[in-house]
Swiss-Prot record:
Protein species of origin: Aedes aegypti (Yellowfever mosquito)
Residues of this chain annotated as glycosylated in UniProt: 33, 128, 238, 274
UniProt family annotation: Belongs to the CD36 family.
Tissues expressing the protein: Detected in the antenna, legs and wings. Higher levels of expression detected in male compared to female.
Primary location: membrane
Its job: Plays an olfactory role that is not restricted to pheromone sensitivity.
Protein name per Swiss-Prot or TrEMBL: Sensory neuron membrane protein 2
Length: 542
């Protein structure tokens, strides 16, 4: 019965709860407000202040559900929707004014810095093609080419990255709206979901650069109907799904319940380094559940695995001890040091060392220092993952910024799991997103910057079962277990009582009556006394 209550069988209460999470998850965002942006521009140490949480309801609903023929697998996608929770966020609002790192400008500049020749060649080609369509320009261009055959009208030292970046530097004001620093004054509404506009009413070279940005198809940037663009950190997650999952229903093998078989039709990723062509490294393996549920009977399990599409990787969580939630016994699991603190060839997982952020603060082997993970290949942007407030990160990063206060109670990833059903009772996925801020040759705004791993925001995505769900588990599981516990002790007590009564009954049934014993005993005694001649009394009578 316990196993059947954890299997994913259609038209059962368990299936309905799996299909639509019966309560919204909490999605909390903490943004790092920069208090000295202009000092940072001058090369000083940044100071940040955490502002949050900005709380959102996260609703999840599975659709496109299809079962395999033998019902052992189920395919689905999961829609997500975010709604601002003004009450839980109070006194903070989505319209608060904050100063944050200008992520999209910083990202675009770093990408152009590393791919300048390719980018410049592409947008020069676009501009040339556009000009060729204008008759007057075409005639003038032909005349210039005849007098200067080595260079066309737009050939500006094509092989020189330096000159290419100078060209881009001249267009920054048109693309990003006259920025006076690498920081942005914005609101949580714009920065997180609605979008920060850029590439508005651009022409010429600026328009060509914006076209190159559009071609990258970065998920945090959306093209608007008028051709302009908007950057937002989480809008790509809103009213969308993160792909198609195929998971085990547990009908044939309960120990595999909710374990992922395929994601988008594959059991491997292509985001991390593979040791050889045609092979897949362990960094690219898709293993575990999606974290919304686990197989039953977790007692004695030392380690579990979660696949997170948000960070394009599998994460191990280890058992750290017993716990409880609202009176329900649980097992607590947390991420271990392999998640962020032990990455590199010495740990056998250097496939995570993608080394895609030039001029970053890295070890000699190209890996980031302890506590940081390069997500460039996951985000298609130079984003770095850490624990909140860079908890556990190397001093090469933490010593360069003021305002970080790591606290395991607030910042550790954890989940409390009910051991018999594998149900998560309470938990939080807590991660921080950062970017390297550094000098880029020929970009004036970056001239005096010191290379720093700069915190942008951290999130806590989690669940704490509400009263209704706690009551459901208490009624359907804990009271049954309590009843079974009572029955067990009644049976033990009954057994002990029987163990005491049965020998007594047996002894009574086996014991002879008193009338049959006395004559025999008397006769025997008299006979012995006479023959011994006085062993028990005086001399025999004469």
């Amino acid at each position: 019965m316990m196993v059947m209550n954890t299997e994913l069988r259609q038209d059962t209460p368990q299936f309905k709860r799996w299909e639509a999470v019966p309560q919204p998850l909490d999605f909390k965002v903490y943004i790092f407000n920069v208090t000295n942006p202009y000092e940072v521009q001058m090369g000083r140490r940044p100071r940040v202040v955490e502002v949050g949480p900005y709380v959102y309801f996260q609703y999840r609903h599975k659709d496109n559900i299809r079962f395999s023929r033998d019902r052992s697998k189920v395919h689905f996608s999961q829609q997500q929707m975010y709604v601002f929770d003004a009450e839980s966020s109070y006194p903070l609002t989505e319209n608060d004014q904050l100063t944050v790192l200008n992520m999209h400008m910083n990202s675009i500049l770093q990408i152009i810095d590393t791919q300048a020749k390719e980018t410049i060649t592409n947008f020069r080609s676009d501009v040339n093609n556009t000009l060729e369509k204008i008759p007057v320009v075409r005639v003038i261009k032909r005349i210039i080419e005849k007098t200067t055959p080595i260079q066309s009208i737009l050939q500006l030292a094509e092989d020189e990255t330096y000159d290419s970046l100078r060209l881009i530097n001249a267009e920054l004001n048109r693309i990003f709206g006259r920025p006076d620093s690498m920081f942005l004054r914005t609101t949580p509404r714009e920065f997180l979901f609605e979008g920060v506009p850029f590439c508005v009413n651009v022409i010429g070279i600026a328009k060509a650069i914006c076209k190159e940005i559009e071609k990258r198809n970065t998920k945090t940037i959306r093209v608007q109907p008028d051709g302009s663009m908007k950057f937002s950190f989480f809008n790509h997650k809103n009213m969308t799904n993160d792909g198609t999952y195929t998971i085990n229903t547990g009908i044939k093998e309960p120990a595999l319940t909710q374990m992922i078989e395929y994601w988008n039709g594959r059991n491997t990723l292509d985001r991390w380094i593979n040791q050889s062509a045609g092979s897949s490294s362990k960094c690219n393996k898709i293993v575990g559940t999606d974290g919304s549920g686990y197989p039953p009977f977790r007692e004695g399990v030392e380690r579990m695995t979660i696949f997170s599409s948000d960070i394009c990787r599998t994460v191990d969580i280890k058992y750290v001890g017993p716990s409880s939630y609202e009176g329900i016994p649980a097992l607590r699991f947390e991420t271990d040091s392999h998640f962020l603190n032990e990455i590199g060839p010495e740990y056998g997982n250097d496939c995570y060392c993608v080394n895609r952020i030039p001029k970053a603060i890295v070890k000699n082997n190209g890996c980031l220092y302890k506590g940081a993970l390069d997500l460039s290949t996951c985000f298609d942007a130079p984003v770095v993952l850490t624990h909140p407030h860079m908890m556990g990160a190397a001093q090469e990063y933490t010593s360069l910024i003021d305002g970080l206060y790591p606290d395991p109670e607030k910042h550790q990833i954890f989940v409390d799991v009910e051991p018999l059903t594998g149900t998560p009772l309470n938990g939080g996925k807590r991660v921080q997103f950062n970017m390297f801020l550094r000098r880029i040759d020929s970009i004036r705004l970056t001239d005096r910057l010191q290379t720093t791993l700069f915190p942008v925001l951290w999130i806590e995505e989690g669940i704490a079962l509400n009263e209704d769900m706690v009551k459901l588990i208490d009624d359907s599981l804990m009271k049954v277990l309590t009843l079974l516990d009572i029955v067990q002790w009644v049976m033990i007590g009954s057994g002990l009582l029987l163990a005491i009564i049965m020998p007594i009954v047996y002894f009574i049934k086996r014991r002879p009556s008193s009338g049959s014993i006395t004559p025999t005993l008397t006769t025997t005694t008299s006979t012995v006394s006479i023959s011994d001649g006085g062993g028990l009394g005086g001399n025999p009578q004469k």
